[in-house]
């Protein structure tokens, strides 16, 4: 199977998000890469589901709460930007302060 660099990046994010979901389900606090992957995957999947950029900007803030991540992680993520594939093309989605 041949994958483009973009497809490899998406697959890596999805794999890291699966690991983060499992750790979160076990009650573990997520670290920086796990938190970013989980929020990013939620945005990418929402785009594929047909949600608008505005909806995803709002939804991205509800993926994780401060008590679900390790100390200091929320402050390390002021913004998350993801190029997501929508039914009408690729768009940049920016979520400001994703972990409240």
UniProtKB/Swiss-Prot annotation:
Pathway: Nitrogen metabolism; urea degradation; CO(2) and NH(3) from urea (urease route): step 1/1. Pfam families: Urease_gamma. It is found in: Cytoplasm. GO terms for molecular function: nickel cation binding; urease activity. SUPFAM superfamilies: Urease, gamma-subunit. Its main location: cytoplasm. Its EC number is 3.5.1.5. It is an enzyme of class 3 (hydrolase). CDD domains: Urease_gamma. Gene3D superfamilies: Urease, gamma-like subunit. It catalyses: urea + 2 H2O + H(+) = hydrogencarbonate + 2 NH4(+). GO terms for cellular component: cytoplasm. NCBIfam families: PRK13241.1, urease_gam. PANTHER family: UREASE. Heterotrimer of UreA (gamma), UreB (beta) and UreC (alpha) subunits. Three heterotrimers associate to form the active enzyme. This is Urease subunit gamma. It comes from Leptothrix cholodnii (strain ATCC 51168 / LMG 8142 / SP-6) (Leptothrix discophora (strain SP-6)).
